[in-house]
Swiss-Prot record:
Species annotation: Haemophilus influenzae (strain ATCC 51907 / DSM 11121 / KW20 / Rd)
UniProt GO MF annotations: ATP binding; ATP hydrolysis activity; ATPase-coupled transmembrane transporter activity
PANTHER family reported for this sequence: METAL TRANSPORT SYSTEM ATP-BINDING PROTEIN TM_0124-RELATED, MOLYBDATE IMPORT ATP-BINDING PROTEIN MOLC
Protein known as: Uncharacterized ABC transporter ATP-binding protein HI_1272
Keyword annotations: ATP-binding, Nucleotide-binding, Transport
Amino acid sequence: MVISARAKIMLLETQNLAIGYEGKTLVQHIQFTLEENQICCLLGANGAGKSTFLKTLLGLQPPIGGDIVWQGKSLSDYSPTELARHIAYVPQAHSHLFPFLVQDMVMMGRSAFLKWYQTPKKSDLDLALMALQELEIAHLAQRYYHQLSGGEKQLVLIARAIAQQAKLLIMDEPTSSLDFGNQIRVLEKIKQLQKQNIALIISTHNPQQAAFLGDNIVLLDQQFGFQQGDKKHLLTLENLAKIYRTSPELLHQHLNNHIEKSL
């Protein structure tokens, strides 16, 4: 008897999406798809529209045109609270003005499941502590977030998203302000999340990180538009040279052939 593999479930797709702000269109004709348990890395130069694309997918910025569909339903039909139960956002590690304990920062991921008058329950605290344990940072639970290192802060923000129990995590340059060791630690944790049936969209400036993480790549550029595909076909020196306005020869020199070797 032949047992066929289970078909992947489509989580997110865009239909002729146009993105921009204040009425100005940055990129249009975006046909994007994301399946469950898929990592998609988003590459583009500064000002290409990466952050605008992510904000639009998160429902924080309205599209200029087209539609975004989450599990067969238009994103516009979800309330912000409903959407937060499905999609979590992981920003870059940042300083915080208020002295929150790490466990309290992570418990904020449970806010989408609470009424405005409710306080977190023991079950919410348990989920927060489980998320910290999962990332091997449970020892930070009683530390103050603002006193942590950049790498520790980034892992706490990822733990907050895990506590949110979302099916999709959207990360905006999660390693941009980290030293090399912390970059490696964060990247390894991201790979582990995929094994837990979590889909991820990750914006990065680093093609080598995209080659390591992504089974799917998006190239975003105002001149060349939107391209999505597997890394073998898209993550080439020629394509990178186009979006970063440089030459394939210089890229080859500075990347030490890592892109080609990774394929």
